[in-house]
């Protein structure tokens, strides 16, 4: 009855109704402005210390041109570091249609990932780029779906006894050694590391290996999968670099590669499910089969886990041995330690923990070339970060809902205040007594920190130790400097071209 009377009154007072409706938007905008002002004042926020000068303040076509044409793909990460040196550790790029904050400040990154992580979520331009190519796996999920997938993955990675995993590593390492000539001829270790980590990851997580290092089968199908996977990975990164403008880019080759990737996965999953089982503990595939009802969803999760377990470890190994080959005195020092601790026998997990210099070398490679060098979040509500405001950039900065937050680990790892001088050089000794805290973030941080971190480090430490035991000399056959190939995980564009001798 009341609603009918109210509607009748509105119809009889049409002009008043229009006026009232027209006031709603400005009143809400004013209320938002006041609320944000109060939050900003309460937190002591000041205006951004550094803002990017823009030519197109509406859509940002000058930003699009800069990303597509002004930055060399092999120097993209270096250019971001140069931008921070020019603009400061936190700066703002503001348009009428969108706003982004770029930071390499450890305090801000800690705020985004841990202290106020509930204020931030995965950005749409990440989920809408990765999702259509690699599906709805753990790296694009949020909320309950993400927690569930992470719980299943944690169960797969939680191995109380590392001995069976080390046995898997040793068996695959012996297949790896057969592919490495010792007559002084050149070999690119990077694709071999890719094959090694692919075989280990699939056997460990799915109970069925791709056997890419086996000399008893044709690897055409597996190599096509690896090539297609890399095409898709590079396309994802190129689109993500465009941020909110990613929809303006399209790649037919990547779409064709995606179809072949899923066709391979469908076949491989069938082979894994039908392969003989020895009654051992469950793996990721069997755990996911119990919770994922459709084959597409299963393939999505597998693709994302391959990124976490294969790409990152192989990229780390390739980057590390690029520099070890360039610096034979470091490799000699590493080899001396490994032989002193473990002799010539395959090392145990306990012995690996005692190899201090080995861990320094791995840490230094992760510092210099973090396998996931940049990442992003979006503010889901009005919030603040502790640095970036005021003239000196040391005051809090207000972050409005919808602001894209790009945090750069690659640049953060070049902070001389945390890591000492010559941060562009590979110097493992810098890790003696070094405690960088949130200034060192090779595996992300907070609730979304890499769940397979210990798995990846154990695999890396083992392979590095076995390489040091197996080969007396490691020499570079590449006279060029390290160049980036920024796919979903960072690796050397020129590989790791070396010669070895026993």
Regions found by a protein language model. Give the residues of each.
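Hydrophobic, well-ordered secondary-structure elements that form the walls
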Residues: 334, 365, 402, 426, ...
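Cytochrome P450 I-helix active-site segment
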Residues: 166, 170, 220-228, 282-284, ...
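C-terminal, well-structured subdomains that either form a transmembrane helix-short loop-helix hairpin
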Residues: 301-304, 310, 395, 400-404, ...
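Cytochrome P450 heme-binding "Cys pocket" and the immediately downstream C-terminal segment
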Residues: 182, 328-330, 449, 453-491
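Short, small-residue alpha-helix embedded
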Residues: 312-325, 463
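N-terminal membrane-proximal hinge/A-helix region immediately C-terminal to the signal-anchor transmembrane segment
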Residues: 2-148, 163, 167-178, 196, ...
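Cytochrome P450 heme-thiolate monooxygenase catalytic core
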Residues: 19, 122-128, 164-317, 333
């Amino acid at each position: 009855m009341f609603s009918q009377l109210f509607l009748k009154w509105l119809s009889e007072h049409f002009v008043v109704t229009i006026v009232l409706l027209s006031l709603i938007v400005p009143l809400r905008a004013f209320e938002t402005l006041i609320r944000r002002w109060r939050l900003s004042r309460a937190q002591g926020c000041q205006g951004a210390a550094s803002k990017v000068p823009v030519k197109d303040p509406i859509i940002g076509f000058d930003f699009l041109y800069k990303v597509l044409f002004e930055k060399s793909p092999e120097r993209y990460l270096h250019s971001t570091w140069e931008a921070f040196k020019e603009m400061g550790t936190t700066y703002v790029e503001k348009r009428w249609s969108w706003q982004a904050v770029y930071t390499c400040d450890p305090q801000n990154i800690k705020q985004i990932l841990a202290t106020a992580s509930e204020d931030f979520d995965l950005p749409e331009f990440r989920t809408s780029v990765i999702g259509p190519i690699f599906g709805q796996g753990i790296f694009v999920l949020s909320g309950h779906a993400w927690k569930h997938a992470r719980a299943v993955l944690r169960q797969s990675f939680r191995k109380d006894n590392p001995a069976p995993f080390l046995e898997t590593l040793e068996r695959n390492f012996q297949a790896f050694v057969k592919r490495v000539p010792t007559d002084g001829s050149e070999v690119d270790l990077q694709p071999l590391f890719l094959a090694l980590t692919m075989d280990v990851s699939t056997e460990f997580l799915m109970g069925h290996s791709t056997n890419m290092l086996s000399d008893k089968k044709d690897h055409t199908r597996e190599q096509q999968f690896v090539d297609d996977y890399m095409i898709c990975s590079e396309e994802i990164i190129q689109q993500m670099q465009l941020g909110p403008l990613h929809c303006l880019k399209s790649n037919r080759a990547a779409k064709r590669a995606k179809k072949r990737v899923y066709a391979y996965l469908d076949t491989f999953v069938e082979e894994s499910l039908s392969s003989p089982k020895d009654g051992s503990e469950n793996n990721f595939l069997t755990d996911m089969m119990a919770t994922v009802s459709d084959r597409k969803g299963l393939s999505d999760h597998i693709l994302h886990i391959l990124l976490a377990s294969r790409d990152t470890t192989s990229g780390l190994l390739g980057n590390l041995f690029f520099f070890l080959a360039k610096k034979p005195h470091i490799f000699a020092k590493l080899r001396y330690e490994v032989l002193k601790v473990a002799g010539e026998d395959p090392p145990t997990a306990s012995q690996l923990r005692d190899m201090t210099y080995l861990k320094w070398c791995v840490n230094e490679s992760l510092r210099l070339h973090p396998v996931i060098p940049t990442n992003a979040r979006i503010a889901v509500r009005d919030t603040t970060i502790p640095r970036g405001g005021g003239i000196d950039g040391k005051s809090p900065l207000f972050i409005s809902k919808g602001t894209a937050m790009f945090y750069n680990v690659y640049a953060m790892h070049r902070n001389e205040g945390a890591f000492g001088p010559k941060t562009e050089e590979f110097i493992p000794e810098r890790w003696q007594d070094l405690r960088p805290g949130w200034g060192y973030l090779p595996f992300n941080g907070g609730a979304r920190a890499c769940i397979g971190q210990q798995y990846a480090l154990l695999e890396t430490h083992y392979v590095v130790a076995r390489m040091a035991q197996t080969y007396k000399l490691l020499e570079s056959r590449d006279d060029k400097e390290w160049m980036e190939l920024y796919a979903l995980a960072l690796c050397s564009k020129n590989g790791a071209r070396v010669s070895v001798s026993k």
